[in-house]
């Protein structure tokens, strides 16, 4: 068992995701894949590095995901700028041989795990994303001694859908954690009126990854407006939710 493969409720924060992330770089593309094994939620993201500072991209991505464990190839640490960023997470690093980061092997691994002939039904994944995702699930299966837990199909997060905030700015904004490391003096603590663990994790994820996609922003605002205009229904639903167990983690 590693920090990123814990699933025991008594060892996890009920309102925070326990994220393990994998990084894979191919040419000018950074592939990210992350998983919360306690819920089965599984994501990938492709980030273009063309005309961008790779160290800044890496820093902002890791700060956004706040992983408890990071899978990275040994060759990735040879870049001094990237090494300095990853060194901030040194206690969370699991370094793997570069030879394991093969996109074709990763693709086949994903097809075997999800029992599909092609990944096209799940989305249009880049080679970098596929590599990161395949490495991640292979690592999880190895740590679980071949007993792969329930994992949702991979969801692609598009680069221009969420705001990228560098690590220093995110820290100063005190979104999820204050400058002193206190979780009780943050934007999340002010906003969090959730009554379930599932809702708490969802809110924390949304605060950490602000949307920049206008249609999705308006969709969320429409839902907020509806419940603001129907206070009795809102309170009735809150009362019902209070008795709901953490189904995400129970099912996983």
Model-derived features with residue positions:
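Amphipathic, charged alpha-helical scaffolds that flank and support histidine-based chemistry
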Residues: 228-237
């Amino acid at each position: 068992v590693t920090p990123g493969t814990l699933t025991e409720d008594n060892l996890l924060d009920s309102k925070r995701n326990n994220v393990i992330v994998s990084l894979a770089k191919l040419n000018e593309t950074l592939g990210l894949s992350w998983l919360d094994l306690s819920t089965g939620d599984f994501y990938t993201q492709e980030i273009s590095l063309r005309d961008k500072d790779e160290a800044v991209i890496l820093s902002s991505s890791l700060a956004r995901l706040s992983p408890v464990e990071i899978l990275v190839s040994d060759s990735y640490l040879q870049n001094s700028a990237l090494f300095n960023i990853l060194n901030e997470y040194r206690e969370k690093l699991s370094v793997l041989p570069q030879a394991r980061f093969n996109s074709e092997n990763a693709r086949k691994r994903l097809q075997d795990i999800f029992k599909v002939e092609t990944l096209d039904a799940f989305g249009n994944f880049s080679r970098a994303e596929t590599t990161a995702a395949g490495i991640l699930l292979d690592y999880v299966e190895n740590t679980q001694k071949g007993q792969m837990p329930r994992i949702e199909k991979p969801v692609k997060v598009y680069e221009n859908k969420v705001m990228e905030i560098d690590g220093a700015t995110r820290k100063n904004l005190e979104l999820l954690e204050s400058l002193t490391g206190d979780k009780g003096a943050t934007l999340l603590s002010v906003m969090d009126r959730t009554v379930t663990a599932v809702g708490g994790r969802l809110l924390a994820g949304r605060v950490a990854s602000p949307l920049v996609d206008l249609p999705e922003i308006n969709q969320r605002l429409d839902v907020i407006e509806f419940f603001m205009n129907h206070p009795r229904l809102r309170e009735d639903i809150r009362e019902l939710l209070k008795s709901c167990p953490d189904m995400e983690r129970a099912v996983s």
